[in-house]
């Protein structure tokens, strides 16, 4: 076969297209830390009653793998429940994400011989300095998981459906800021929206600013513009200089050349924020790169 300049050009173009089909839909810039919040819906898919099985859990974990976040807040986890074959959902998600996460689980309430709660996943390159789990006032059980790192603190939560409880929980979280001497991120399913008047966000916005994408809704299938309830908020400390590089509510993602509609994975969309921390040392960056 005669090899011409045109055939080489076509070959290179084909290779480029093939490469792009496998590229990450939401690539991370060098030097950023990706924070993510995602309500798992107990890994039963995007509908109710859904199906509790390993396949749905693996599909969920595959989304985490593709998004490659460094710190993750997860809601609606179960652990050792009799009717759910005593699975530990956070363990399963971490294992099947293949990202070697450190796991932090917080029990919100007892459930069927086990428990339900929230979790935080942390890449091993980012050393945890302290963990605090704080019960929030609620009839059904709500918890705040605070994970402290060298340069910031990360709070993970899932607030109540009841308006009064939710406002009390927001006030308790804001009070916790008095005991933290570093910038704080709050991530989770707030069951509340910055678009709603005189509820939890009226409390939060006295101390936090919204860092995450708020374009549209975080619950699939909602036509009205009132279903943005999953957030990552930021409370600065001493003008830290932390930068918000980018944020997205992720509704579709391409994995191995296939587009995945995330409404089929959970009844919430994942939300991420990429941040940069001034002065991240070369040693920290090298450790991050080596472990990833």
Q: Where in the sequence are the language-model features?
A:
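Generic enzyme active-site microenvironment
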Residues: 37, 73-74, 156, 187, ...
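Structured beta-strand-rich core segments of catalytic domains in phosphoester-bond hydrolases
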Residues: 77-153, 245-250
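Active-site environment of divalent metal-dependent phosphoester hydrolases
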Residues: 42-46, 79-82, 111-113, 162-165, ...
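Loop/turn elements at helix/coil->beta-strand transitions in domains of secreted/extracellular proteins
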Residues: 30-33, 67-70, 99-102, 152-153, ...
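Active-site neighborhood of phospho(di)ester-bond hydrolases with catalytic His/Asp-centered motifs
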Residues: 72-75, 104-107, 185-189, 212-215
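Metal-dependent phosphoester-hydrolase catalytic domains
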Residues: 24, 131-133, 163, 175-185, ...
